[in-house]
C-alpha cells in the first residue's frame, strides 16, 4: 500500500461546522470537543488522527447521533448530502443509519450481537431499508461476504460471532456497512484489535471497496502508519480541537503545528533507534478540559529547543477560550493555533527548520 493521490473538487458528502460536545461531570463541564470543522468528499478518505481521549470517537458518535444522553451536541452545521442531521427526528435518523451512512466500530466482537447468527444480522439492514424479498436479500448478503473475502460465504451465515476469528468478524462488519451502498462510512479504529498481517489485509480491502463503491470514508485512528497508507486528507486532533488539516503529503512533508511535528517525531525509524537514539516523545501531559479552559492547550509541551529562547504562551488567560488563529499555508493546508504566542513561536521554529 502507498499514499493515495488526492482528487480535487469532490462532491461533499459530509460537512461539519463548529461542532462542540459538552459533558457534565462531577467537577463541572467537560468540553470534550470544541468548535471543530471537517468535510468528507465522495470517494475520499479523511483520516482523523490523535491520541486516545482527544475526542475522535465522540466526534464520530455525534455525527451518527449516537452520543450518550448526558452529552450535549451543538453545531452550526452537521450535514449529510446537504441535509441537516440536527433537524431530523430519531425515526428519520434510524432510516439513515445503516443506509446512507454506516459505522464500523473498533471491536467487532462487541459490535456484533452474540445471540444472533451472521445471516440474521446482515439481513436486517437490507430488509429494513430496501424493498427486497428475504431470498433476494440473502443472495446480496452472500455476494457481499464473498466480495470482502469470506469464501465460501454460505456456511458462515449459520455461524455466530464467537465462531469467527477477529479478522473475519471485522470483514463481516465491513460487509454490513456496505450492504446498502452508503454515501459515508465512519470507521472508528477498525484495525486496532487485529494483528499487523490482518490489519494490512483489512486496510487493503477497505481501500479497494471504497474505490469500487465511490464511498466517502471518515477514518479514525491514532496510527500514523495507517494514515500514510490510506488517507487522501488528514485532520490532526488534540485535546478536543482540530489543530491542523490538509492533504496527506502536506501533513507528512510539511507539518506546521507543534503537536503534528511531535507526532511525526514519535514515529520509529528502522535503524535509528538504539542506545544513543531513543524513541521520540512529546513532553508534558494532555491538559484537562473541564470547565472554561482559557489558556493554551499545548502550553508546556513545546520542545526544549524552542523553550530555551522563547517562553510559549505567556498568556495565562485569553479573552475568549474559543478564539483561534488560522494560518493557510496554501489553499488546502490549514493550521489552527490557540493564541498568537503559539503562532509566532511556531513560525519561528518553521523558519529555523526545527521539528
Walk through the language-model features, giving the residues of each:
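P-loop NTP-binding/switch modules centered on Walker-like glycine-rich loops
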Residues: 65, 186, 190, 194, ...
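Conserved ABC ATPase "signature" region
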Residues: 84, 136-155, 264
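ABC ATPase NBD coupling module
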Residues: 85-102, 128, 250-255, 287-293
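A short, proline-enriched helix->beta-strand linker immediately N-terminal to the Walker B motif
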Residues: 179-183
Amino acid at each position: 500500500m502507498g499514499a493515495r493521490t488526492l482528487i480535487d473538487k469532490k462532491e461533499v458528502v459530509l460537512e461539519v461546522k463548529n461542532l462542540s460536545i459538552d459533558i457534565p461531570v462531577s467537577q463541572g463541564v467537560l468540553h470534550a470537543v470544541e468548535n471543530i470543522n471537517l468535510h468528507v468528499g465522495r470517494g475520499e478518505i479523511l483520516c482523523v488522527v490523535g491520541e486516545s481521549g482527544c475526542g475522535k470517537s465522540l466526534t464520530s458518535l455525534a455525527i451518527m447521533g449516537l452520543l450518550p444522553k448526558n452529552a450535549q451536541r451543538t453545531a452550526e452545521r452537521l450535514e449529510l448530502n446537504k441535509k441537516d442531521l440536527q433537524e431530523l427526528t430519531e425515526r428519520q435518523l434510524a432510516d439513515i443509519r445503516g443506509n446512507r451512512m454506516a459505522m464500523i466500530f473498533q471491536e467487532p466482537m462487541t459490535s456484533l450481537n452474540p445471540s444472533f447468527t451472521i445471516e440474521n444480522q446482515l439481513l436486517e439492514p437490507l430488509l429494513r431499508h430496501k424493498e427486497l424479498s428475504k431470498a433476494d436479500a440473502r443472495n446480496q448478503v452472500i455476494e457481499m461476504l464473498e466480495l470482502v473475502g469470506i469464501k465460501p460465504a454460505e456456511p458462515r451465515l449459520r455461524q455466530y460471532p464467537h465462531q469467527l476469528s477477529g479478522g473475519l468478524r471485522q470483514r463481516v462488519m465491513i460487509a454490513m456497512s456496505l450492504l446498502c451502498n452508503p454515501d459515508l462510512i465512519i470507521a472508528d479504529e477498525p484495525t486496532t484489535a487485529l494483528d499487523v498481517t490482518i490489519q494490512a489485509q483489512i486496510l487493503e480491502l477497505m481501500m479497494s471497496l471504497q474505490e469500487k463503491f465511490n464511498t466517502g470514508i471518515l477514518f479514525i485512528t491514532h496510527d500514523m502508519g495507517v494514515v500514510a497508507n490510506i488517507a487522501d486528507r488528514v485532520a490532526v486532533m488534540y485535546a478536543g480541537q482540530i489543530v491542523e488539516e490538509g492533504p496527506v503529503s502536506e501533513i507528512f512533508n510539511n507539518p506546521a503545528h507543534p503537536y503534528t511535528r511531535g507526532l511525526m517525531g514519535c514515529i520509529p525509524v528502522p535503524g535509528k533507534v538504539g542506545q544513543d537514539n531513543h524513541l521520540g516523545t512529546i513532553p508534558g501531559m494532555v491538559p484537562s478540559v473541564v470547565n472554561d479552559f482559557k489558556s493554551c492547550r499545548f502550553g508546556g509541551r513545546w520542545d526544549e529547543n524552542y523553550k530555551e529562547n522563547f517562553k510559549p504562551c505567556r498568556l495565562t488567560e485569553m479573552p475568549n477560550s474559543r478564539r483561534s488563529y488560522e494560518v493557510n499555508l496554501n489553499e488546502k493546508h490549514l493550521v489552527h493555533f490557540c493564541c498568537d504566542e503559539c503562532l509566532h513561536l511556531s513560525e519561528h521554529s518553521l523558519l529555523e527548520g526545527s521539528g
